[in-house]
């Protein structure tokens, strides 16, 4: 079995994601491992640093920026409207949960 691993810059733009999709679309069985998109890990580290410094507003801004980035990817990559809506709803739900937890941190740190 073939294992294909793609790092963050390999999936960092819509064009690169499409290229990876072409590479893995062949019918032979394989395991595909994808890293977070380029910059995502850095964003998460910045969010964690903001939370550590109790800068909830800055953390909220960074989370929202990351959310919009993922929504942009979904809008550009997905052509089927139903699939696109489902993906965006999933992204919105996950980020809303994150923001809800952020509100709890803010509430308990006062």
Regions found by a protein language model. Name each.
Residues 1-110:
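Nucleotide/pyrophosphate-binding catalytic subdomain
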């Amino acid at each position: 079995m073939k294992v294909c691993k793609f790092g963050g810059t390999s999936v960092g733009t819509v064009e690169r994601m499409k290229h990876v999709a072409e590479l893995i679309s062949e019918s032979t069985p394989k395991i595909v491992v994808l890293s977070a998109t380029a910059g995502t890990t850095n964003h998460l580290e910045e969010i964690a640093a903001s939370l550590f410094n109790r800068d909830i507003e800055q953390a909220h801004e960074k989370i929202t920026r990351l959310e919009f980035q993922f929504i942009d990817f979904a809008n550009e990559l997905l052509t089927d409207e139903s699939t696109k809506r489902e993906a965006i709803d999933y992204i919105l739900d996950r980020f809303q949960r994150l923001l809800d937890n952020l509100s709890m941190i803010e509430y308990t740190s006062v």
